[in-house]
């Protein structure tokens, strides 16, 4: 009833120059679709800094479905 031990296959050795070429081709000819990257790129084009998570301009409750309101953020202590 015991299963035979799986046969371990040896991988061929990888050369350092092969890795360098592969890393360069990973994102070549592909558009980056990250939202963070898009926001950073837009801010760079406008000449302003990207929004920070430590900025008080955001309340932390913003989501894709529910945008921040114009009213000031509510305090958790008040």
From Swiss-Prot:
A Pfam family per the record: Mustang
Compartmental location: Nucleus
Nuclear localization signal, short sequence motif: residues: 6-14
Keywords per UniProt: Myogenesis, Nucleus
Sequence ranges of Basic and acidic residues compositional bias: 64-78
Signal peptide start and end residues: none
Tissue-specific expression: Predominantly expressed in heart and skeletal muscle. Detected in skeletal muscle satellite cells where expression increases with cell proliferation.
Region (Disordered): 1-33, 45-78
Chief localisation class: nucleus
Family: Belongs to the MUSTN1 family.
Function, in words: Promotes the differentiation and proliferation of skeletal muscle satellite cells.
Protein's recorded name: Musculoskeletal embryonic nuclear protein 1
Underlying gene: MUSTN1
